[in-house]
Amino acid sequence: MTGEGMGDRRPLASRNTRWAQTLARRMTALSVTPNQISQTSMLMAALAGGSFWLSGAAGGAGIRVALLILAALFCQLRLLCNLLDGMVAVEGGKGEADGPFWNEFPDRIADILIFAGVGCGIAMPGLGWAAAAFAVLTAYVRELGRATGNPSDFGGPMAKQHRMAVATGAALLSIIEALWSGGSWVLTAALWIVAVGSAVTVLRRAGNLVGHLKTTASTRKSESISGKHDA
């Protein structure tokens, strides 16, 4: 199973930037562990989801704008935590025995908190939960692939970094909407984009996995037959 986003570590261009490497080195020098950074990502997601939720009930445009700015900021801080925990663990050599759990579990909670928060904020909790469910399912298929001995499939079109880009962009665009009409069309569209995009991602990853499993089985069968003939 080869292609874009395949392997055992999510391909991120930001990992090779000077600022990220400098920040990771500083974090490594401190007593902060990768697990603590991963746990902090859930806090950032909770703050993002809470900001989205409260923005829908804000009494004035000014308060709503402030909450949307905070939501965008916390979405990006969630991604920053996701970047740094891996860098501190791998490049910093501070990986822990339970690291694989904390590398995955907080991400699932974070997606749920953010998208459920958006849904509640625009009075469409069902859509928010649908986006959250499909987001979690993308990771499930990826981990299912790894559990069956295949490389992790980080392909899109709606992988984690794409989902956070949509959420952040929607929060910022909603500032204009808040000042103009006070509606929530931008966030509604964003949830649909995440839900549908995540569903497509699930199908794409599932198709890759099934195809690879069949190819592997066929290869093993051919090798077995060839071995019998050689004997």
What are these regions (language model features)?
Residues 1-72, 113-231:
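Hydrophobic alpha-helical transmembrane segments
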Residues 12, 73-77, 107:
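Short secondary-structure transition/capping motifs
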Residues 64-100:
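Glycine-rich active-site/cofactor-binding loop and its immediate structural neighborhood
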Residues 80-88, 101, 105-109, 137, ...:
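Active-site His/Glu-centered metal-binding helix of metallohydrolases
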Residues 87-127:
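Basic, amphipathic juxtamembrane/active-site segments
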